[in-house]
Amino acid sequence: MADLSLVDALTEPPPEIEGEIKRDFMAALEAEPYDDIVGETVEKTEFIPLLDGDEKTGNSESKKKPCLDTSQVEGIPSSKPTLLANGDHGMEGNNTAGSPTDFLEERVDYPDYQSSQNWPEDASFCFQPQQVLDTDQAEPFNEHRDDGLADLLFVSSGPTNASAFTERDNPSEDSYGMLPCDSFASTAVVSQEWSVGAPNSPCSESCVSPEVTIETLQPATELSKAAEVESVKEQLPAKALETMAEQTTDVVHSPSTDTTPGPDTEAALAKDIEEITKPDVILANVTQPSTESDMFLAQDMELLTGTEAAHANNIILPTEPDESSTKDVAPPMEEEIVPGNDTTSPKETETTLPIKMDLAPPEDVLLTKETELAPAKGMVSLSEIEEALAKNDESSAEIPVAQETVVSETEVVLATEVVLPSDPITTLTKDVTLPLEAERPLVTDMTPSLETEMTLGKETAPPTETNLGMAKDMSPLPESEVTLGKDVVILPETKVAEFNNVTPLSEEEVTSVKDMSPSAETEAPLAKNADLHSGTELIVDNSMAPASDLALPLETKVATVPIKDKGTVQTEEKPREDSQLASMQHKGQSTVPPCTASPEPVKAAEQMSTLPIDAPSPLENLEQKETPGSQPSEPCSGVSRQEEAKAAVGVTGNDITTPPNKEPPPSPEKKAKPLATTQPAKTSTSKAKTQPTSLPKQPAPTTSGGLNKKPMSLASGSVPAAPHKRPAAATATARPSTLPARDVKPKPITEAKVAEKRTSPSKPSSAPALKPGPKTTPTVSKATSPSTLVSTGPSSRSPATTLPKRPTSIKTEGKPADVKRMTAKSASADLSRSKTTSASSVKRNTTPTGAAPPAGMTSTRVKPMSAPSRSSGALSVDKKPTSTKPSSSAPRVSRLATTVSAPDLKSVRSKVGSTENIKHQPGGGRAKVEKKTEAATTAGKPEPNAVTKAAGSIASAQKPPAGKVQIVSKKVSYSHIQSKCGSKDNIKHVPGGGNVQIQNKKVDISKVSSKCGSKANIKHKPGGGDVKIESQKLNFKEKAQAKVGSLDNVGHLPAGGAVKTEGGGSEALPCPGPPAGEEPVIPEAAPDAGAPTSASGLSGHTTLSGGGDQREPQTLDSQIQETSI
């Protein structure tokens, strides 16, 4: 009666369904068991009525439970017990005991039963109806057992109980995490129970009379079970052994513990279950069968125990569908379980089947989970074991299988992690990583390079993250530049498709550009000779590239594309640079620039190292990789540094960007020297030439800082643009340089800061430029070289318009200075023309400075800048002179830039992690402001300089403290996290206690294991029962196989036909054509009583079609069998 009470408790949610189901099951069970009783002695005949009855009842059930059909698929694996749970299971139980075809029949039935089985799954929500079914089933089982308990007891104990317990199972799944284990173990156990039922069926027959006693014993049994329930509660993690006791007790216990232990025990059990599933299957097979045998033998309570044991089994099976519903794993589990059914010798191999069912479902569960884990890693939470397995599988199997996918996912994850800092960098990381992947396929070192690049990409992304953190306040400038960097990266990625070899350079050079300044330090002295070796340095850098895994493939790529484009440009430029460098060195300005260049690079390296310190380690690897292109640019940067020292124009935006604050005074002086020397123009020309390729790289940031500004304002020298056109043609190079700009962002961050100072210094620098201004000839030369730079800007712009985008923010800042410088340098008479253009261009640039965030805007503006500069080669030169007059307007623009950028720069500085270096830079900026102020006085433009001073000093003063404060806040946050960890430590102790409790449960399990001792004996009995069943099944299999062949009408029929051909050649033909053969065979169907088994198998297929068809195939089978016989 405990079932009734439990049913009452459980039936409360869906009593209507329970009533209907009860009616259906009662009618089906009552109607079917009669057929079963009739066929008990001859199991084959039982199968036939079962098929009919199952069709009827199953169809009615399916009609009743059509909605559950969706879960039927999930219920398929547990379809055997589900069929039993559906109430047809009693018949199926007999069928199971009868022959393996029962499983086929069960399949046939359980398609309908799937709905019914799914109904129990739905009943998982409606636990009562299932248990009501248990009660009803127990009653029909009592009836059936009265009729013939041999099979029904087994069925009731196994399948019937499975149905009843399936009812429990759904709640018990909720209440028991064990059910997943049980689902595996009980799945095997159910088959074993069935096998046990067959041998036990006689015992169960002996239990028939105890059945009544059992019902009376049920209260006492329930009492003992209640006692067990307590122990079981402790034993809930006890897995299958406890699960059997629990499940028996769970019938009573489930209502109270339906949902209580569920999640935790499910989680823990699911873990251990999946791990131990196979052993648990064995244990559960041993324990549960033994439990069942205990229920059969040790307990006359078999009705309850068997039913509850069946519940446990069904719990297991429903848990499988439940797990399938939860994990979507059940369908494969079910399918594999179905194959277990397909092995019509489930009784023979029931021990195997339990293992198969258990192993296959767990594997499917794990595989499915792993597969799900692959798509949804969050699924790992289903079970930590699955997490470990899925992780190992994902890392070992899925990564090998889908290395690219996992890598892409990992990179995506990395990108996502990067996303946390900033989406732009996330895009950069993703795009960079993906291009790396695209490149990696090209490179045979895909996987290592993937990981290396992954790591590099990761590290690169975090530096950018830091840069973002630093640039977040700068966001108007750096973020827009980051967005521009994104676009720039995207363009290189597009070119990754176009220039897979070139793009690696671009991306790698991007990173190299980041650390360019540090390497520039070394190359600063090298820059003199490096200009000559720029092309060679590409190769040398390639040799350096091996430092990173990508270096090797990149070496080839660097040598291939950059040397082609850059080498071509640089080859042409090298002679010029060589002559110019020689002239520069002869004039001794090189001596000044070397010192200046080296300190600048050092400062730049310091700033870069400070900002990129997070990035440099990965970036240094990339630097070494990218250095092939980056170093040539660095030689240029070295030259440009010299030129920077000579001209604060910020030709090499990289070094100038970083050091202009520190070097502004020498830069104007140096500018004066270059102006006086006229070779600065050549040097700048060499820069422009060398930098056309590398310029976009370093200047990518530098360009953002100075070069683009120059090119923008310099935009003169359409002829010098020709060499740039080559880089433009080698847009890959320009874009790679654009990518460097992206990676250089750390610098742009610095540059952003420097840009403020630069913006302010740019005015003084324009003032120093004004000083040399009288030297129009050198100015013109520089203008020409800047025109080359300008062409470089356009070339890089046209390919990497996005590059100007980022630089635009910085460019705008630097442009006023550049424009002023250029104006001072080129005081040509075309001022009137250039004024409008340069003023508008400068204003545009200034607007981008304030409005740097709109990358498209800035790029468009930058383009117009370069467009007028290009369109007016002479006019662009004139622009520069034009700027001489408008230089006042340019200072105004710079004022606007400083005013607009000052707050942004402040925010940037505050966020910049390397605020200390920035502090130094602001200091340098202040010095620049002063000297520039003097230069400005010389230029007659002290006001903008003063404004720049005030803005730069204020911004610089504000920057360091803000950065410090942020750092402190981070530290505080860490301390808080630590305190939380302290609480976690306490939590650790709590789990320890939980573990100890689990151990106690294990001790309870040991107690249960003592019970299992008797169960172990029972195990031997089921084993014998299995053997006996197997022998019977073998006989049935032979017949059923031929019949099954007719059922399959595919493989078995032809095979059987061949055999039949031997027996009777005439029938061989009908056999191959089962449909044709079936009709003539129909009359012969009657002779074989065994035909029903095959008929049941046929009906398994035919059940859906209809009873009449089932009978015909049966007759066909009978003929075939007769022929074979």
Curated annotation (Swiss-Prot):
Residues 53-67, 563-579, 742-759, 812-821 have a biased composition (Basic and acidic residues). Phosphorylated at serine residues in K-X-G-S motifs by MAP/microtubule affinity-regulating kinase (MARK1 or MARK2), causing detachment from microtubules, and their disassembly. Phosphorylation on Ser-760 negatively regulates MAP4 activity to promote microtubule assembly. GO terms for molecular function: microtubule binding. It is found in: Cytoplasm, Cytoskeleton; Cytoplasm, Cytoskeleton, Microtubule organizing center. Tau/MAP repeats lie at residues 896-926, 965-995, 996-1026, 1027-1058. The modification Phosphothreonine is found at residues 260, 277, 349, 410, 447, 494, 503, 511, 658, 915. Residues 254-265, 728-741, 761-774, 1093-1104 have a biased composition (Low complexity). One of its GO terms (biological process) is cell division. This is Microtubule-associated protein 4. It comes from Mus musculus.
